[in-house]
Swiss-Prot record:
One of its GO terms (biological process) is signal transduction. The modification Cysteine methyl ester is found at residue 212. A motif (Effector region) lies at residues 39-47. GO terms for cellular component: plasma membrane. It comes from Coprinopsis cinerea (strain Okayama-7 / 130 / ATCC MYA-4618 / FGSC 9003) (Inky cap fungus). It is found in: Cell membrane. SUPFAM superfamilies: P-loop containing nucleoside triphosphate hydrolases (SSF52540). PROSITE patterns: RAS. Keywords: Cell membrane, GTP-binding, Hydrolase, Lipoprotein, Membrane, Methylation, Nucleotide-binding, Prenylation. This is 24 kDa Ras-like protein. Residues 179-199 are annotated as: Disordered.
Amino acid sequence: MAARAQFLREYKLVVVGGGGVGKSALTIQFIQSHFVDEYDPTIEDSYRKQCIIDDEVALLDVLDTAGQEEYGAMREQYMRTGEGFLLVYSITSRNSFEEISIFHQQILRVKDQDSFPVIVVANKCDLEYERQVGMNEGRDLAKHFGCKFIETSAKQRINVDEAFSNLVREIRKYNREQQTGRPAIAAGGGGPAGSYTQDRHHDEAPGCCAGCVIA
């Protein structure tokens, strides 16, 4: 048992996005299977969870970050240490969607890379009647970034585990590419981004996030 723990791979995941998009709710739902319905602006919280992804044990170190502009100076610090990023916006807020490009550009600048493991996450898909950002817009933005896209609901636990698991897969793929110098085959796929449909969570409400895809 001790020998196995010695080789336990740790992944540093960072959840970024504007204020009020549900970053903390998404993170706590993933870590604790609990929905936090009150909004309490986060400065910075760290969580750890051990799980199995594609038959490999992984220790996830998840950093939930501040979305408010006044904490912007802290961003570069966690961007330097993060191995992968969930870029979260709310489908009910066009402003939060537009902020995603700023976060993405900052990550690439801090990392001094043309690409890096990220996933665009459209949260609050249970609030379809308040939608301001179309699914195709999120998918197109992710395609522009060269990454995957997923719609989630922290409240109804829709695609929450899938968002974090797929980010770990992207980190693994990125690391293989860095080691071999050539593109790796995506886990669970084999085609380019956007080539397969994400299964909806079994607890999903009818009509919510219909046809959620990772693109």
